[in-house]
């Protein structure tokens, strides 16, 4: 089991839980945090025991407030070679293609959107808030809002970006616009995320889950026609046609699942 300085990691029953663990800094990410996030995704890419991941944070105040501005960040001298220290901390940026559920507690601000923009869905506690403080500090809000444009309407992203620290989006509002898929009391946050993760991990075929994800993310970032063409390839990679047909025939023999109504 890997160990880290700024992350907590545990796994059981096919589910890994990654916890940002700098509550004294509102779980802001320093250089060590960024290196460890990249390392944990690399570890998970080769860990077939894990079928689903929960990404959360320690404490009630914040999921993450983005970059730790008190940290030491090296930059090239040229303005055309600026390093964004947290641009590659998310699962997709590290080529990790198994489901990741974000369990958001407290504030999610600025650079936290690099993480939230690359998860499959978000469950938030009722005390969660979302905002981007860049313009309030005299800095352009650019990359983080671009991630949010994939999950929120343009007007909502504009409002969040331009108002900066003057306004925070509540968990309920985030749910209304589709950024968040479920809002629960703080005490129920991890249990709810784990229920979803264990349900996903229980799927009989791992490749079916991965192909579903790959298809939907492809459709999100390209044209429908291109995505549909890719979908044929994803079906083939997940199993030969005769295998899929055989599985379809066996549906009636499967144990009945009693669904939860959300």
Question: Residues of each region from the PLM?
Answer:
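C-terminal alpha-helix plus adjacent terminal tail
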Residues: 1-13, 71, 165-173, 187, ...
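Conserved CoA-thioester-binding segment of acyl-CoA-metabolizing enzymes
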Residues: 1-56, 60
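Hydrophobic/aromatic residues within transmembrane alpha-helices
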Residues: 18, 55, 68, 115-117, ...
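Histidine-centered beta-alpha loop that forms part of the nucleotide-sugar donor binding/catalytic region
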Residues: 21, 67, 105
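Glycine- (often His-adjacent) and acidic-residue-rich active-site loop
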Residues: 57-95, 108, 136, 250, ...
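Short, active-site-adjacent cap segments at secondary-structure transitions
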Residues: 60-64, 109, 131, 216-219
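Crotonase-fold acyl-CoA enzyme core
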Residues: 94-204
């Amino acid at each position: 089991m890997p160990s880290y300085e700024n992350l907590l990691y545990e796994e059981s029953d096919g589910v890994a839980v990654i916890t940002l663990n700098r509550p004294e800094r509102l779980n802001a990410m320093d250089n060590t945090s960024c290196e460890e996030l990249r390392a944990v995704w690399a570890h998970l890419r080769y860990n077939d025991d894990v079928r689903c991941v929960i990404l959360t944070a320690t404490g009630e105040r914040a999921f993450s407030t983005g970059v730790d501005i008190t940290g030491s960040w090296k930059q090239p001298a040229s303005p055309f070679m600026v390093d964004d220290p947290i641009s590659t901390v998310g699962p997709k940026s590290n080529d990790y293609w198994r489901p990741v559920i974000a369990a958001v507690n407290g504030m999610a601000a600025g650079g936290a959107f690099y993480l939230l923009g690359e998860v499959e869905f978000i469950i938030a506690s009722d005390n969660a808030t979302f905002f981007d403080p860049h313009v309030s500090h005299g800095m352009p809000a650019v990359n983080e809002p671009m991630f949010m444009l994939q999950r929120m309407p343009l007007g909502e992203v504009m409002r969040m970006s331009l108002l900066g620290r003057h306004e925070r989006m509540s968990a309920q509002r985030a749910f209304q616009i589709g950024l968040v898929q479920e809002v629960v009391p703080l005490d129920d946050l991890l249990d709810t995320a784990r229920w979803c993760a264990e349900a996903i991990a229980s799927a009989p075929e791992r490749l079916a889950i991965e192909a579903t994800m790959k298809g939907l993310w492809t459709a999100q970032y390209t044209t429908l026609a291109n995505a549909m063409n890719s979908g044929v390839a994803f079906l083939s990679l997940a199993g030969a046609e005769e295998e899929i047909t055989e599985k379809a025939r066996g549906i009636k023999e499967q144990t009945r699942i009693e669904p939860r109504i959300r």
